[in-house]
Amino acid sequence: MEFVVQLLNKAGGSINDMSMDYRGGDIDLSPDKPRGLPFLKPLYGLPPYQYTDDVVLMIVYESEETAIREALPSELEPMPGNIVTMCFFLCPDVTGMGARDFTMPCIPARYGDYVGQFVPYLYTSTDASLACYREVQGWPAVLGQTETTEAQGRVRARVVRNGREIIHATATVSGETITSLDFLPVILYKEIPAFDGQSCDDAYFVTTTSLLTNLNFKAGSGELTFPDADDDPVARLKPIKIIQALYGTLDDLYPETIRILKNLK
């Protein structure tokens, strides 16, 4: 930046008094119309996003209250039961972002009287989804690969990050088909740090809902471990009791609704 200022000063101008009496580039920018970056080929499209034929494994379990509170901001209170749902998604067809896979723990919590589920960590497999999750939606995403296989009702899933298997799950499902699920609204914290590192350009809690269709699930039992998590904080959410496993497919329009819960600015 100092070098740029020196060049401007040598040319007889400064950053503060530069006028706009020149043609400029061909790209028009406006805060009312996001362009996406990089300009000529944005990494991802703008929402909403249609997910089609998602393959999903959910392990519902009870965890330690202390571990759950470690993962929650002070504005949120965990719901009774100390429930966590670990969700493994394979997404072969997603508008705007392309095929990918991701895994996230969802913690039922309330903001005042509003009940939703907070997502403290998320592992996604592509650079496009990583950037979109963090920049647009506020999901706390890092890179990680989700693998899921199923044969005759036996399901296996795992998450690999930096060559380490940090999450491993198995499930056995059978019985009647489940065509509807009570999926709580998601609560996210979106933060954009300021360039000086001393404050935030934006910081707020937002809640979103999904339009889930074409659900086809079966229920059963499961197991969940963190084999080689090292210092990854997701491993703090260890299960003390498995409640249920769900496995199946769905379509998802996201987001269906958006609402700001609290602006911290």
Language-model segment annotations:
Residues D32-K33, P42-L46, Y51-D53, L90-D93, ...:
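Short secondary-structure boundary micro-motifs
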